[in-house]
């Protein structure tokens, strides 16, 4: 029995050894587990990579870019020398407001918003009541002054000359702007400097074949308005000096109503060429590139005008000098306030104001007279 037990135990031991030798090692079957995690991470990582490109850091500029930060509202604190409140019915009272007329030399919607902000701010500063209106044409603003339906105006340069000659309107402030220029401008080194003058530019559709004044014959042409200095009066003088009769040499002409409208018409091919202020194509207030991103490529400049004194603010001659003084003070205060600056920038791209004497435009008027231009004959 004992011998049989010994033999049985020996057989069991041999059987275990055989099984052990035939079975795969435990470490060999578990080794893939150790190598699998890196394999899974490596193959899945590319599918998760777009998360990095969608990170908030790359989206932030489109959500809230610094340039879109709204400007602060204008500070309209009451002026120290504000006049006493007018009696009912007097000029400046609620039922007889001081009317400010603005010429439609740009986007009338933007002009209306900015003009309303100016009227409201002057009301708070002076204790007087102001009301704004945008003329349907340049001439409409002039005639409102002549009829004393408006007492304050923001006219362009030539309209100021007309209003001076016809109704005795006097300039009080001239606009100071960062000088806009282009590559053809002899004064391009002044670009960005604050100056009381500007220039006009002749533009053409890039596909029109126009590169000089001589090429304009037989083409269609867009002006701004018959009372626009850089968009009509001065360009006509220059056209005639370069052998182009603006009344006979074009296949068609039209008055587009504003400088941005001229640029848009040329861009769309409604006019082969036209004239605007420098440089309406990239002007911040006109903001044409927001609607037509390629406008500077499809519209080309081929000539520029001489210097033209800037526009500004004027008064009718019968307005009380004390009221004139306080209005000037209020406008200068707005021009020195960040919120006020933003309003003036949106209005007509003003950067600042400079007080001027009544004879400020006399030299320019003399140039026009020498060229045979009589402002009194051009009131439309």
Name each model-derived stretch.
Residues 103, 176-188, 196-199, 253-256, ...:
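Periplasmic-binding protein-like
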């Amino acid at each position: 029995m004992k011998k049989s037990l010994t033999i049985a135990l020996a057989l069991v031991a041999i059987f275990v050894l055989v099984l052990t030798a035939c079975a795969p090692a435990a470490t060999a079957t578990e080794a893939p587990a150790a190598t699998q995690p890196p394999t899974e991470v490596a193959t899945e990582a590319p599918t998760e990579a777009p998360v990095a490109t969608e990170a908030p850091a790359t989206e932030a500029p489109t959500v809230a870019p610094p340039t879109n930060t709204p400007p602060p509202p204008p500070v309209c604190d009451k002026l120290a020398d504000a006049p006493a409140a007018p009696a009912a019915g007097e000029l400046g009272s609620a039922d007889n407001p001081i009317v400010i007329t603005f010429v439609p030399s740009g986007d009338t919607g933007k002009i209306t918003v900015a003009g309303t902000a100016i009227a409201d701010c002057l009301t708070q500063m002076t204790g007087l009541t102001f009301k704004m209106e945008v003329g349907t044409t340049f001439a409409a603003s002039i005639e409102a002054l002549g009829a004393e339906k408006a007492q304050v105006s923001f006219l362009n340069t030539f309209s100021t000359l007309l209003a001076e000659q016809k109704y005795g309107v006097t300039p009080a402030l001239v606009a100071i702007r960062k000088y806009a220029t282009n590559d053809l401008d002899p004064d391009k080194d002044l670009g960005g400097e604050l100056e009381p003058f500007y220039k006009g530019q002749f533009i053409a559709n890039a596909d029109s074949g126009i590169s000089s004044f001589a090429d304009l014959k037989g083409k269609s042409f867009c002006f701004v308005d018959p009372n626009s200095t850089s968009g009509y009066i001065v360009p006509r003088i220059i056209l005639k000096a370069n052998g182009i009769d603006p009344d006979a040499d074009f296949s068609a002409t039209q008055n587009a109503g504003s400088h941005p409208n001229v640029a848009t018409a040329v861009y769309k091919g409604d006019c082969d060429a036209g004239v605007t202020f420098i440089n309406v194509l990239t002007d911040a207030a006109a903001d044409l590139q927001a609607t037509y991103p390629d406008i500077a490529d499809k519209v080309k400049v081929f000539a520029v005008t001489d210097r033209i004194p800037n526009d500004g603010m004027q008064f009718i001659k019968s307005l009380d000098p004390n009221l004139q003084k306080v209005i000037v003070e209020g406008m200068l205060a707005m021009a020195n306030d960040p919120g006020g600056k933003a309003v003036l920038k949106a209005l007509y791209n003003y950067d600042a104001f400079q007080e001027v004497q009544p004879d400020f435009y006399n030299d320019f008027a003399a140039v026009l007279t020498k060229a045979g231009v009589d402002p009194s004959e051009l009131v439309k």
